[in-house]
Amino acid sequence: RRLSFTESYQDLADVEIVFECVTEKLAVKYEVYHQIEANCPHLKAIASTTSAISPADLAKGVATREKVMVAHPYNPPHIVPCVELVKNDFTDPEALEAVSALLEHCGREVCWMNKPAPGFIANRLQHALYREAVYMVEQGICGPEDIDKCIRSSWGPRYTSIGLFDHFDYAGLDLISSIETYLYPDLCNDTAVQPFIQERLDRGDLGYKTGVGVYDWRQRDMDDFR
């Protein structure tokens, strides 16, 4: 049996690596860490799956800060193999290697960060794209439907096979540089939530969970979408 369930920390006495997946509140995480430290004498690493909290802040709540790191999976984790591995300033390299080896054994694709940054790797890239997409809609350049269609039918499929820097080298850095020189001045550099999103937040239109967001989800087949 691959999974077993318990409500007692005492049942974790033989555990060496813990993945923490509790709510994104430091006080709650700290209490879990204290219980783990008290009940896991063979502990090698605590890996938080947080999508937002810095490993430095996580480490403040434990006695064994050298064992703490972030191992952030990407949704949906049963389909998408990426796990971002982020250390704090005191994380033991052996702890990182132990977690990385376990993740790779489970078929995960481990992406290492040399130092923490808000949003880690994937969300920083993704939200830069979100910002530009919203800007294009606000400027009347195109609608949400055509942006989504373009992504699904252009570089979305391409980047399942190659990475950004693979593409840079394939296209040629001289060509990439010429495009950037022409394009960068025209890109969005907003540093706050854009009106297109804020107006929907103010109306309570949050997306699928409320039935309406950018799109009207009330008449869509959600089982098919999922």
What residue spans do the PLM features occupy?
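AAA+ ATPase "lid" subdomain C-terminal helix
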Residues: H127, V137-Q139
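Rossmann-fold dinucleotide-binding core
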Residues: S48-R124
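A general alpha-helix detector
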Residues: P81-C82, L129-A133, S178-L183
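NAD(P)-dependent Rossmann-like dehydrogenase/reductase catalytic/cofactor-binding core
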Residues: R108, Q139, P144-R226
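Rossmann-like NAD(P)-binding element
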Residues: R1-I46, I53-S54
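Structural signal for conserved beta-strand scaffold positions within catalytic alpha/beta enzyme cores
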Residues: F5-E7, M69-V70, W112, D216
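A general structural motif at alpha-helix termini
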Residues: R1, V62, C150-S154
